[in-house]
């Protein structure tokens, strides 16, 4: 597995776009914020924006793209939302309908006006752990970070509600 920890976000996005990276991005681009992408029909965007505002620990909102835009000008200048992520999971009416490496067709569909949200990701603090000498097991093993559904309710907003999901990292005891 190639080490992309010192790579720039732009370089990693280009490699993903070229199909050269197809794995989760944990451990990549140390020192940069990483984000999760949520893309919704415009008619749901306001409710989701409120959901993020009411639940900043669960959904730390980094940026919202203009309707129909495929880039985040502040956090991802030159990015292509539809092609710069190793794997997209598409949900319709709460059910996963497919996994894709390119979702351009969804953005190109004139019947859809989509709004994209960039949500902060726990991968962002992993470089600080590594710099402090704390091993990050999922990076060492090349697997995805463990995530758990809790019984902690998020504050609802419009059609959006649910319980908080947390990520966990096993930390060894100090010597």
What residues fall within each predicted segment?
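A short linear-motif detector with a strong N-terminal bias
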Residues: 14-18, 41, 67-68, 95-96, ...
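Long, contiguous binding/interaction regions
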Residues: 2-21
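Conserved mixed alpha/beta catalytic, RNA-binding, or beta-rich assembly cores of soluble enzyme
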Residues: 91-93, 99-175
